[in-house]
Amino acid sequence: TEQMRKIFESLPLIDQDRLAGWKIPFLRDWLSHPERDKYWERTSMGDGYSKIRASAFSVGGWFDICLDGTLKNFMAMTAPSIDPAVRGGQRLLVGPWVHSISRDGKTGELDFGKGSAQDFRQLQFQWFDSRLKGLDSGIDSLAPVRIFVMGRNVWRGEREWPLARTQYRDFYLGSGGKANTRQGDGVLSAAASASDTPDRFIYDPRDPVISSDEGPYDQAAKELRPDILVYSTPPLEADLEVTGPVRAVIFAESSAPNTDFTVKLVDVYPDGRAMSLCDGIIRASFREPGKKPSNIEPGK
């Protein structure tokens, strides 16, 4: 609605709840603590994983806003330093979902088939029957890690996360300085670009790129904006599975003392659709993890 649009466009963020008609204490707390301080430390696991004696059934979705935390928790609970009995009891399930499980196989603008849906309540019963009642519920007959391979639209069992057989590959951004829009000259290649010409864009906070909802949505229309840089590979000649951690390293400068950078990994279909796979965002002042936030020097 028009009212909600005005609320979302208002500043400062901390007052948006008041404009909506009610105060949200936890949101105000979060916005009042932008740095990692004692407020956040008190809820951080830190080295507390070694004290956990219980098994955990970790469930997430490839488009879940909480997926990063879910995977990090599972990795911490299956680390070599964890007691083998506890480590062996952990399970991970990741499907083509957002923060809630799709019951009809549809997420965002894609249909992954009814086989992608899971009877989560039944899985919960099996889990608790095994872990709390000591019954043979069949849950341990499943692989410790079960992931849904999108594109092939099949479930696959694995032994660990990240997958031990992962082959990490580097791809490089390149252009002749005109990577703006999907019609520009930006390329994504396995070989580093010989050109050092920078790509430029003008960011107007009064006309931001609107985020899509959770899930896979077509980004083609957004990629026509001149404030978006697009780097694409040639059409792939063979299937390429991307399963595991994805990281983008960018070198940028800005005329502003602080700004945000967003990177999206997108799957371009033969019909021109550009379906989002994953994305990440960073505020420039937080560019050095673990260090105190600092503004950038304009032009550097």
Where are these regions (language model features)?
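Catalytic histidine neighborhood in serine/cysteine hydrolases
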Residues: 80-106
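Surface-exposed acidic, glycine-flexible loop patches that form ligand/cofactor-binding
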Residues: 45-51, 82-83, 135-139, 239-241
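Extracellular/periplasmic catalytic domains that process cell-envelope and extracellular macromolecules
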Residues: 50-52, 84-87, 162-165
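C-terminal, loop-rich substrate-recognition/catalytic regions characterized by aromatic stacking residues
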Residues: 2-17, 102, 108-300
